[in-house]
Amino acid sequence: SEAYRLRDMVMKDPSLVGKKEDIKVLADANVDVWLAGNIDRSLPDEQQQLSPEVRQLADEMKASGVMENTFNTNIFVSPDSRSSPATSGLAGAFMGSLFMMLIVIIISIPIGVASAIYLEEFAPKNWITDVIEVNINNLAAVPSIVFGLLGAAIFIGWMHLPLSAPLVGGLVLSLMTLPTVIITTRASLKAVPPSIRQAALGLGASRVQTVFHHVLPLALPGILTGAIIGVAQALGETAPLLLIGMSAFVASVPATPFDQSSALPVQIFLWQGNELRNFFEGRTAAAIIVLLAMMIGLNSIAIWLRKKFEVRW
């Protein structure tokens, strides 16, 4: 808060005691909404959040230049706050999303790619593999909220993992992303011409050598693209995270995946439904921009990797 900031200034430089010092402080959320024009000024006093004196003072300070609109950079370094909405930030939600994406990458991509290689190149064609393929395709079409229910039952109810932790969110999103990674990887492997396999086998290469030395490098651009798009899709999911407790208010920045946290999509949902949503409009827009920037970044990486490793024949 501003009081703590003032205390820290004095403790850092005791010579400030007895001096006049100009400092900038954040206005109250209701004052911000009033000056932004998001409140009907024609409403009677009993329906206004601010007293007539405070409203008049705010207008006078705005007109005289004492109060001004500036970009609050603390939104990127501060966690959410209920006691002081003006200091609310995205740091906690951003770190929560970052931890979850790392878990998704570590779990879903290796397992998904390995499963796809086995099913496409090595698994015998029988009724068991047919059932597995049908189930994978069905899982890819399951609504994401079902994975949230599954995660709440298994990871929280049965395994007793911490509620609202990025670890649980990452595991749930990994389950949701796995079918997408498997399907895109198999499609990339199928796109490699059969003549590549036949030529390698004809020159004496084993089945394993053919797959890992010749087929997989050619399929790599499609595999990487599908994996990153799956991660980007998981980044924007909200419904499964609500069911594992990530909608709870958390006023701290997580240091590990085991700490309680929120996520960017959930934070957007909470701010938009807040009773002070008029005040949180700017913060909601900033959170959306950050989320879109992350997704655009992931998709740009996917396009770059595809262009870099693409092989034409």
Segments (PLM) and residue ranges:
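C-terminal transmembrane helix and the adjacent membrane-cytosol boundary/short C-terminal tail
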Residues: 186, 190, 194, 201, ...
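Transmembrane alpha-helices
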Residues: 184, 193, 207-245
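Generic hydrophobic transmembrane alpha-helix motif, especially the helices
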Residues: 80, 84, 137-173
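Hydrophobic transmembrane alpha-helices
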Residues: 135-142, 154-155, 170-181, 231-235, ...
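Glycine-rich helix-loop "coupling/hinge" segments at transmembrane-helix boundaries
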Residues: 232-278
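Membrane-topology segments of multi-pass transport proteins
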Residues: 1-86
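Transmembrane-helix boundary motif in ABC transporter permease subunits
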Residues: 104-136, 149, 157, 303-311
